[in-house]
Amino acid sequence: MVRLFAASLSTIAVLAAPPLTAAPSPPIPMSETEQSAPALPPILSMRERAKVIDGILAERLDTVIPQIMREEGVDLWLMMSREYFEEPVVASMLDAKSMSARRRTILIFHDPGNGAPIERLTVSRYGLAGLFEPSWAPEDEPDQWQAVADIIAARDPAKIAINYSDITAFGDGMTHSQFMAMSKALSPEHRERIVSGETLSVRWLETRIASEMELYPSIVRTAHAIIAEAFSRKVITPGTTTAADVQWWYRDRLAKLGLTPWFHPSIGIQREGAQGMLDGDTVIQHGDLLWTDFGITYLRLNTDTQHLAYVLKPGETKVPAGLAAGLKNSNRVQDILAANFEVGRPGNVAMLKSRSEAIAEGLDPSIYTHPIGTHGHGAGPAIGFWDNQEYDPRGAGPINANTAWSIELTTYAEVPEWGGQRVDFRTEEDAFFDGKTVRYIDGRQTEITVIGPQ
């Protein structure tokens, strides 16, 4: 046991975390070209992160909420969360110091009409950093839901949106118990005006504002820099390091940086003569094609990246041509899919059209692209699933402008250097759709990373 522990330490370099910076550095511009071994951007201190998070949240509340409520013709939107049981929309509206709902937190947005500002009310015992107006005096009305009913009666909205949905968890935050309590407090007339807040929820969560897109490239660059470290001889010693070693290196690296993964990192190995993807305790060897799937959460935005690396054999100086061509095939499918983004087009249509075009070019694709942003697998229409390349209800919704995406897909190809073995060339890169063009947030991998001699 002791020898195994010591050996695992010797296989992976423990890299010192850079000091936390007290202020944001100049923004990194969006780029179509990905750097092969980028420097790690400065990581903000927790205090500075809170300033950024709260500033963006205030701007989103000021701009996105009026836009989506007026798009949907909803004049009152009500959401509820209970402590440690936050629904996803409410969780995204809490300031940086409000780490969960308190007791029962009820948020109300009301549009008075005629272009007047949206009212933002919190019917709870605790304020939310001045972002919502406290609107409950328990000493006057102890029943919290009756206080909500009184607010609604005073405003007499035509539509009362609450979050329930059969399709998406993002729009299904109202629990049965709380719905029953709310319904009991509301008048029969107002109960009849309840509508689903599903679309409001999706639009709030999927919409990215300019301030977020100014930050996003540095966040994706951070993920790319960490992947570049993982796919290097700093971390990987062929013949010694296992796939699981690299997975746990990622976790330790993020902990040292004060960052969070939103899923456990993946490392897979494809090897000449071996079927499928090897993982876990499999030792990485010369001649292996490595795959990683890695995502972080930072400043309330998420990344999701899949890259490939090749471990040179002794005497080799470059990636075998058949493997290099396989990645180019996946890049071509990325191009086809990006060209098929269109405002209002259902995700299903974008997937089916792209897949058909790729197959017509002689490629063997599987497309499973998803929105990203506030959540890793974000709100909005799916564009295919790895296990379903046909119509899916979750892909029926429209593609909207000002949304971020993980362009996730694969192609399969027979590699001559491996005796015609069928190899899986998985790729995933984060991108932004402005309504006209899909642009990569920090470029995309177009060449397989080379892991050479020490």
Label each PLM-derived region with a short phrase:
Residues 1-4:
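Positively charged n-region of N-terminal signal peptides that target proteins for export
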Residues 6-16:
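Bacterial N-terminal signal peptides
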Residues 18-22:
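Sec/Tat signal peptide C-region and signal peptidase I cleavage site
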Residues 23-454:
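Active-site neighborhoods and metal-handling regions in enzymes and metal-associated proteins
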